[in-house]
Regions:
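Phosphate-binding/catalytic loops
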Residues: 94-148
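Conserved small-residue
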Residues: 20, 60, 86-87, 128
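Conserved active-site segments centered on acidic
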Residues: 2-77
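Generic alpha-helical secondary structure signal
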Residues: 54, 81, 119-122
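Structural signal for conserved beta-strand scaffold positions within catalytic alpha/beta enzyme cores
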Residues: 43, 88, 106-109
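Mid-chain, well-packed structural core segment of small domains
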Residues: 72, 78-101
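Secondary-structure transition/capping residues
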Residues: 38, 42, 67, 82, ...
Length: 148
């Protein structure tokens, strides 16, 4: 059987936080850079803040990733249903984060950057980058395991 000409379904990773204004937006930006072929990133929040945190935009631009055109989005059931992997960026309140009710959610527990110093937001950015790189590497490994 030839796989030539067949298109595999694009796999989706959903990054979730409350406001979808910084952590999940940075993760989406990094995933777009590091994702293996065939993967798509989406970020969303339970109570979107509106504009993306300008400090998050700034610290991402410092390393050559532009998230200024990304939009804060409310999480929808179809996003959850259609996601292959879901990352909870760090919300711990079950009332504000439905990701806590879903099985197979990866918990990252990343500190909220809102109101933090520029240096602290850079540290948070770097933490997110390392986690996204590891996630991308893990996805490559798992996609290389073929079951017959």
């Amino acid at each position: 059987m030839s796989l030539q000409g067949s298109r595999a379904k694009e796999r989706t990773v959903l990054f979730v936080c409350v406001e979808n204004a910084a952590r999940s937006q940075m993760a989406e930006g990094f995933f777009r850079k590091y994702a293996p072929e065939g993967y798509l990133a989406i970020s969303a929040g339970t109570m979107p803040a509106g504009p993306i945190n300008p400090v998050a935009i700034q610290v991402m631009k410092e390393i050559g990733i532009d998230i200024s055109e990304q939009k804060s989005k409310i999480i929808r059931e179809d996003m959850i249903r259609n996601s292959d992997d879901m990352i909870n960026m760090g919300c711990v309140d079950k009332q504000s984060c439905p990701a806590l009710f879903i099985n197979n959610v990866i918990e990252w527990g990343i500190e909220e950057p809102k109101g933090k110093s520029l240096e602290k937001v850079r540290e948070i950015r770097d933490d997110i980058e390392q986690r996204v790189k590891q996630l991308a590497a893990d996805l490559v490994k798992s996609s290389q395991q073929v079951n017959y």
